[in-house]
Structure formats: structure tokens, C-alpha cells
Amino acid sequence: MAAVVAATALKGRGARNARVLRGILAGATANKASHNRTRALQSHSSPEGKEEPEPLSPELEYIPRKRGKNPMKAVGLAWYSLYTRTWLGYLFYRQQLRRARNRYPKGHSKTQPRLFNGVKVLPIPVLSDNYSYLIIDTQAQLAVAVDPSDPRAVQASIEKEGVTLVAILCTHKHWDHSGGNRDLSRRHRDCRVYGSPQDGIPYLTHPLCHQDVVSVGRLQIRALATPGHTQGHLVYLLDGEPYKGPSCLFSGDLLFLSGCGRTFEGNAETMLSSLDTVLGLGDDTLLWPGHEYAEENLGFAGVVEPENLARERKMQWVQRQRLERKGTCPSTLGEERSYNPFLRTHCLALQEALGPGPGPTGDDDYSRAQLLEELRRLKDMHKSK
């Protein structure tokens, strides 16, 4: 019955995803009594022994468009619900993890750590385009992992650095950011798992609210609530003052180099407010995003602002990096202000080109939110060259 429901929900929304889901369902049916799989789903729905999940929040927006590509790229509301609220999402993540490990045995990109007066930030390429991070106090030899979706890759980096993992910071619940929580927290028994209690983070031990601070050695990391991609999405700001270096923003799926995340669980006003939260940070703040999307995002930025010279210079640099499979993070918030269209909704040129004009009461935030929604719609239909 589950296979029929899932196949019906996905009808017309991408044959490839339907085939993947049917394969997962078939495998799951054959192994449905597996003890290990069902135990792995703490904080998420499982096929038995759990109450039925509540309906999706009415704030969750999914608006099919009349032309162009489906903005959720054949994911759809039904698949999103399955991915985030049932055990099928975990099985899908495990399948993607195996494929990525086979395709990119050394990671999808070549990355370099950044060292600042005894604090090291180490990007770890995982899955097909994700980044996890280790934040290390090199004097105390203590480490914090951000979004450790591939526990094997993160553990290898921990062992190579010779550090003790004491905390995991999860930006949000999606499996490509939280999938390694179980294995790492079991391996490192004193490791704490931080995240939003609103998001159903797997193996969460220490819930965080807006402006809460996590202290590890000299590391002072502040959680900032940034809902929109998910209801409980958090970003993490490493304070640069204790080590006399730049602050670092670990942005998950809120903000990318020249892009921002999809609004799965909110609306344009919510996402605009979250983006404005990080816009209030200093220009020298380093941006460490959750995905390697730079080249595609800059290509879209060139469509909406073709005469933006800052974007053109950054695109040339990114293309040189990607020719050698080098990662493109970090950028700075100062750079992002100059070319990221999702941070430029206040710019008159963009408003005149794409915006709907002022709101019914002349509210500037209304027109900026409408412009952000239009940018998101255009980006979802954009095909990078």
C-alpha cells in the first residue's frame, strides 16, 4: 500500500525520483524487521511503534509553476514529507551516501583549512556537494563538528587532526546535514549534539534557542535562529574576538556563495527576516556554507544583474577553482553583499527590474519580500550552462 501511495504522490514529478523511491520501498519491505535500521531513526517517524506524524505546517509553501521546471526539481510536497517525517528519508540518505562515497572516494572537492591564532576551520567535502566542518581549538585539541552528514569522513578528519570531538552543531534536520549524528555520538560518548528543538534533530541532546552560546575551549559559538528553509533552522557564528581573527558564519542551507536556500517551511517574509539577521554581521565575517553551489549560483546572478562587475570577477575566480576541483569556501559577507542577489533586495536596480513595487501601505519590507520570492522562483527555473 505504501508503494502505491508514494508512487501516486510522485506521479508527474520526475520519473527518476519515483524509481529511486520505489527501489527504496522495495528494499525497505524486504528488510522491514531490521533492528539496526529502526534504531537509527530516533527523533523521526518509524514504520512501527510510533504515532502517525502530524500534518505539515500550513506555513509550508509549495507552489507549482505554470511554466519552466518544477521549482522543487521533482521533489514535491509529498516527497518532502516522506523525506523529513518518515524512515524512508533516512534510507534515501543512506543510498545517496553510498553513491557519493563510490563516486568521490576523496571527496567532491579539494579543500584547505584556515588557521587563525590557534583556531582551525577545516572544511570536509561530503556527499555530492555538501560541506561538513571541524572547528578546532588547537591548543586544547578539542573539536566541534558542524553538520556531519558522513560520519566516516568526519571521523577520518578527527583522527588525522588528533583531536577530541566534544560537540556537534546541526543547522537543521535534513539528513544531508544530520545523518552522521548517530554514529559520531555513539563513538564519542561525551559528545553533545546541539540544534533546534523545533526541527526534530536526530540524537539531539542539547536544544538551542536564538542567541544561545556554545563554549568549547576558546571557541565561543552563538546560535542564530534563521527559519525559512526549515522551521527550526539555525546558523552558527564563531566569535573571532577570543582568537583575534575574523568571525566565521556556518550558514547551513540559509546562505550560500551567491545564493540562498529554498523556502521549504516558511514564506518569503520569514526568509527575508532570516537573511537580514546575517546581513547585520560585519563585512569581514567569513561565510562557510553547507553546499558547493558557487558556479551555478553566480551564473544565475549574472542573469539578473548582468553588469555587476563584482559578480564577474568572482565568477572568473570560481571557474578557475572548479577546473581543478578546488572548493570555493569561504567567501566574506562583504563580498556577498556585492554580488549575491538574495542579499540585494534593497537595491533599486533589482527592484525596478524584477520587483512588484511597494506594498499596499508603502511597506518596503513587503516589496523586498516579493522581490525575494520572485528571485527564488527564477532561480528554481534557471538552468546553469
From Swiss-Prot:
Q: According to its UniProt record, how is this protein modified after translation?
A: Undergoes cleavage at the N-terminus.
Q: How is the cofactor bound?
A: Binds 2 Zn(2+) ions per subunit.
Q: Does the keyword Hydrolase apply?
A: yes
Q: What is its EC number?
A: 3.1.2.-
CDD domains assigned? hydroxyacylglutathione_hydrolase_MBL-fold (cd07723)
Binding locations of Zn(2+) 2: 176-177, 253, 291
- Region ranges (Disordered): 32-58
What's the effect of swapping residue 15 to G?
The mutant is not cleaved at the N-terminus. Results in increased protein degradation
**Known function:** Probable thioesterase that may play a role in cellular detoxification processes; it likely acts on a yet-unknown alpha-hydroxythioester substrate. In vitro, it is able to catalyze the hydrolysis of S-D-lactoyl-glutathione to form glutathione and D-lactic acid at very low rate, though this reaction is not physiologically relevant in vivo.
User: How is this protein organized at the quaternary level?
Assistant: Isoform 2 interacts with the sarcomeric proteins, MRLC2, MYOM1 and ENO3.
Q: Which family does it belong to?
A: Belongs to the metallo-beta-lactamase superfamily. Glyoxalase II family.
Protein name as it appears in the record: Probable thioesterase PNKD
Q: What is the protein's species of origin?
A: Homo sapiens (Human)
Gene name tied to this protein? PNKD
